[in-house]
Design a protein with these regions (language model features):
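Bacterial N-terminal signal peptides that target proteins for export
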Residues: 1-8
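Catalytic cores of secreted/periplasmic lytic hydrolases that degrade extracellular macromolecules
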Residues: 2, 19-215
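Bacterial N-terminal signal peptides
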Residues: 8-16
Length: 215
């Protein structure tokens, strides 16, 4: 399935190198490089283009199959563990569907935050933290989860906190879910710039990844 999207300005498809807190206060000025975390609360998020495409929406149904998610990640990181990529693709589709989150958005955000599973920053592979939750700088690398499913579920739940005011459908595993204030503050990916991540181009970077996914 292919979506027709409006083009956005090209930005390099690299992991964000700006530390953030996870929904609970201003983002501290720390020295890069570290992977971006999940959502410090900033009073006035930067304005981004307001495309009407549902592809930009955090909530909704993703259009890509697990096979396409797998091929997309491996195209960008041929050295990734293919078995783990297959597992993560299926988990993102399952967990996103359970909460009504757009699985395409969640998956490309994971690719962005982890450098297509290269990691290399404060968050490491064995942490099963696929979105930088709680990663704010040296000495605070972020949250650890016992397995891939729990880590993916925490990511999906944190996205839902930004994209919707609805309650969770599954048991809460994201300890920072209640720290996102106000709930539903970012119905689309552009609202994540300056809130989820310090990077003011964060939403555009995710849009570039979505464009690539849908090619």
């Amino acid at each position: 399935m292919r979506r027709q999207l409006r083009l956005v300005p090209f930005l390099a498809l690299v992991p964000a190198m700006c530390p953030t807190a996870a929904g609970d206060g201003p983002i501290p000025p720390l020295s890069p490089p570290v992977l971006s975390g999940a959502g410090g609360v900033i009073p006035d998020p930067v304005e981004q283009p307001s495309e009407e495409s549902a592809a930009w929406s955090i909530m909704g149904e993703g259009g890509m199959t697990a096979d396409r998610l797998v091929s997309f990640l491996l195209e960008n990181n041929p050295d990734a563990d293919s078995a783990r990529v297959v597992l993560l693709a299926s988990l993102y589709i399952e967990e996103a569907a359970a909460e009504g989150v757009n699985s395409d958005v969640a998956f490309v955000q994971m690719c962005h935050e982890t450098g297509f599973l290269r990691f290399g920053g404060l968050v490491t592979e064995e942490m099963n933290n696929f979105c930088g939750l709680g990663s704010t700088g040296p000495g605070n690398p972020g949250l650890r989860f016992p397995d891939e499913r729990t880590g993916v579920r925490a990511h999906i739940q944190h996205l839902k906190a930004y994209g919707s005011t609805d309650s969770l459908n599954l048991g809460q595993v994201d300890p920072r879910f209640g720290l996102v204030s106000p709930r539903g503050r970012s119905p689309d990916i552009f609202g994540l710039a300056g809130t989820w991540a310090a990077d003011r181009q964060y939403g555009l970077r995710l849009a570039d990844l979505l464009e690539s996914l849908y090619e």
